[in-house]
Amino acid sequence: MGQTLSEPVTAKESSYCQNSVFRVGSSCMQGWRINMEDSHTHILSLPDDPGTAFFAVYDGHGGATVAQYAGKHLHKFVLKRPEYNDDIERALQQGFLDIDYEMLHNESWGDQMAGSTAVVVLVKDSKLYCANAGDSRAIACVNGQLEILSMDHKPNNEGESKRIIEGGGWVEFNRVNGNLALSRALGDFVFKRANKKPEDQIVTAYPDVETRKIMEDWEFIVLACDGIWDVMSNAEVLEFCRTRIGMGMYPEEICEELMNHCLAPDCQMGGLGGDNMTVVLVCLLHDKPYSDLIARCRNSNKTAFEQEAGTATKTTQSNDNMAETQTSSPTTSPNSSLITPSEATNNSEEQKKLEKEAQDPLLAASEMQLNYIY
């Protein structure tokens, strides 16, 4: 774990956007770390491919430069690949390598030591493409069930370890050369000096890509950095988000609560809950109001909702097999708002604006172009 502050920075940068297809909320928090090194992107409609959405989380290390550069430019590298029109999977893979090459050979970067994970979800014509390099992660909720969209790249994974060793490196204490805790990343050019293809370097930017067909029973997608996944399992994050959607909370509020839930009470927990945190929650509307998704999650998850609204206590298991006890009563921030399905479309000026945007996706998309990088 990196250096920590004496008190966490809990101020959050949160935002939302919506059209007829998506209601997206995001939030990021510095937490216990000395610097904020994450970046994230949500674009409802790509300028060069209208109607195609692009969401991403970048978890930087050794500085924020690579994460910030990727947040501003990775989607552009993907879009300009000649394969994009016929083979988006290949365009994503080559786009990751292209932006990495651009940074490596740009003299203005000097001896850049920073790196970044990248987990990307691109949605085009009801087909989802998830590209991942590193240990940020994406999951989806399909009819209340977990759909895993990416796998973490860790040095101790058999395939990753084989590539590291063949590239001239080694794995020590589950780290690349005893240093880096992930085995694929943008940047980290000190590990990319072998006389090999980019995808065969000790640390490679080459992503795995998963594809899915989005159907009517797809409810939401979560992209987050390991500051979340080190503390909560995939299933726990899914239940956390789905229960709160059923309670009528907006996606950006759920992101804020999720980070609060993961934040360590002190910096003595072995790194768990002490990292920067970034979450993007993409709710799938299917050309219906957000209130329909609220009702769906509420009605099909009544048991979980009733437990969340009460004071029951349950024991959950973290990714690192550490048991923890949590109270199931809702913990809502002062700025959070609980809404019923009927209130969701009738009771606020903000919601009226959202409804207007839902009727005019281009309006929402054009407004988002002003501030889609965080």
Language-model segments: residues:
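PP2C/PPM-type serine/threonine phosphatase catalytic domain
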Residues: M1-Y374
